[in-house]
């Protein structure tokens, strides 16, 4: 039995969906623990592409139980569309369970999110406009609607009559928007409740029962470490906690029950939206990475900013999450490059800095210190073992593992399930220490 957390080690979009999908083969339960429809994951199976925002990747395995935990915020409209899409493809959704204490995104959340971002002008933070921040804000203010409220028409009406009256004042007076029709919203969400009712349970109890039965549980985060509300590049962050610790709060998992943490990073770095990005590439190289990596957001379609691999934020992610091993994705995107650069440290105002600065203003002043390594200029997308990889690609992966001081367990070379090298099964394989007894960093070559 293993309880495994999969987290993003960069700014999201690292390929967690594919890695979670792969690991779901060995999992009995897959749990999404935070975020909402502001994140998406793409999975390619036998040439068929699935784009999901709320439903865990494990849904594609008929015997895997999938849960949406209490730390998520649920947009019923989007969730029902995902259910309908999967069922139209003859993929069963009977194993999907939804936390009754998760909060619900309402129409006023989306309206306020978009209007607030517009009002920020040059100070915008790059929100997706899906209402996630305002939903979490209402949760903190204790005025939110939870799934269990959605299941009780009388309670829902009582809460929404008061809440929409207050939100309409904000919409009209602050943003010059027309008010919402209270009765229309109530009836719309009562309809959603009936569609979702069979899936709603106390997921924390289900998770505890699964642990008692010694089942393998995979906890799936959205976004990435550098977008964490407390540990990311604030204020250019999301409104929840994608880090490994968020899995405990967002599901009811006790911290002593975590067996291992798997971090997912691209072989380079991307970021979508606003905020500092020291290794960002402009010009032809940035465009090359964007084109070869198909770097456009699953949720918004926005073009992602691309740059070299940043080992400073990588080490930070290892530390914050207590990572046991890494999955490196999109190695094949680098196939055409003669040389590759890796950021090993920063320079701030003339001084070397080996650690991630907690101030976004200070982070914006960071200039990357690069180590240049040779590329391989050989296609790797058909490689299926470490021995198939060109030596320069192996050397690159070993270099990343040494810089991060954590072993690499998985290498992804494309979007499909089969375009993967499993160095070590992170669920059933032996848990390795970050350093060997002789003090040298562990690397994928020690597998």
UniProtKB/Swiss-Prot annotation:
Q: Which reaction does it catalyse?
A: IMP + L-aspartate + GTP = N(6)-(1,2-dicarboxyethyl)-AMP + GDP + phosphate + 2 H(+)
Q: How is the cofactor bound?
A: Binds 1 Mg(2+) ion per subunit.
S-S pairs: none
- One GO cellular component term: cytoplasm
Residues annotated for Mg(2+) binding in this entry: 13, 40
Keyword entries, A-Z = Cytoplasm, GTP-binding, Ligase, Magnesium, Metal-binding, Nucleotide-binding, Purine biosynthesis
> Would you kindly state one Gene Ontology biological process term found in this protein's UniProt entry?
'de novo' AMP biosynthetic process
Binding site residues for GTP: 12-18, 40-42, 304, 330-332, 412-414
- Presence of the UniProt keyword Protein biosynthesis in the record: no
The top EC class is: ligase
What GO terms are given for molecular function?
adenylosuccinate synthase activity; GTP binding; magnesium ion binding
- Using the record, list the residue span of the signal peptide; answer none if the entry has no such feature: none
Assembly notes: Homodimer.
Name of the protein described by the UniProt record:
Adenylosuccinate synthetase
């Amino acid at each position: 039995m293993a309880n495994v957390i999969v987290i993003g080690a960069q700014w999201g979009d690292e390929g967690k969906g594919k890695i979670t999908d792969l690991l779901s083969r060995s999992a009995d339960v897959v749990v999404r623990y935070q975020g909402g429809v502001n994140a998406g994951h793409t999975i390619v199976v036998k040439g068929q592409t699935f784009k999901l925002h709320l439903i865990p990747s494990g849904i594609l395995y008929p015997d895997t139980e999938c849960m949406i935990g209490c730390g998520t915020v649920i947009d019923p409209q989007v969730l029902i569309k995902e259910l309908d899409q999967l069922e139209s493809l003859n993929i069963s959704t009977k194993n999907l369970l939804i936390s009754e204490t998760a909060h619900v995104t309402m129409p006023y959340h989306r309206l306020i999110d978009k209007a607030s971002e517009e009002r920020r002008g040059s100070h915008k933070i790059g929100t997706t406009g899906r209402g996630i921040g305002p939903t979490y804000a209402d949760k903190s203010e204790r005025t939110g609607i939870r799934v269990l409220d959605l299941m009780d028409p009388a309670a829902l009406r009582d809460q929404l009559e008061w809440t929409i009256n207050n939100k309409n004042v904000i919409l009209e007076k602050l943003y010059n928007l027309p008010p919402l029709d209270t009765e229309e919203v109530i009836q719309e969400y009562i309809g959603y409740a009936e569609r979702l009712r069979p899936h709603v349970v106390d997921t924390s109890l289900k998770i505890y029962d699964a642990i008692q039965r010694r089942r393998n549980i995979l906890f799936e985060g959205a976004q990435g470490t550098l977008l964490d509300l407390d540990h990311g590049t604030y204020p250019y962050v999301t409104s929840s906690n994608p880090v490994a610790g968020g899995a405990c709060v967002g599901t009811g998992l006790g911290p002593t029950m975590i067996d291992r943490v798997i971090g997912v990073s691209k072989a380079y770095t991307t970021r979508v939206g606003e905020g500092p990005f020291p290794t960002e590439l402009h010009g032809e190289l940035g465009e090359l990475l964007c084109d070869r990596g198909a770097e456009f957001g699953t949720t918004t379609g926005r073009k992602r900013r691309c740059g070299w691999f940043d080992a400073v934020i990588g080490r930070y992610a290892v530390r914050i999450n207590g990572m046991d091993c890494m999955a490196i994705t999109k190695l094949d995107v680098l196939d055409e490059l003669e040389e590759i650069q890796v950021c090993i440290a920063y320079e701030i105002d003339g001084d070397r800095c080996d650690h991630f600065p907690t101030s976004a203003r200070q982070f914006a002043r960071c200039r990357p210190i690069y180590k240049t390594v040779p590329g391989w200029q050989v296609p790797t997308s058909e490689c299926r073992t470490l021995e198939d990889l060109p030596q320069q690609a192996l050397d690159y992966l070993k270099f990343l593992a040494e810089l991060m001081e954590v072993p690499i367990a998985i290498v992804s070379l494309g979007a499909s399930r089969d375009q993967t090298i499993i160095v070590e099964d992170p669920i059933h394989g032996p848990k390795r220490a970050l350093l060997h007894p002789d003090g040298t960093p562990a690397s994928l070559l020690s597998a």
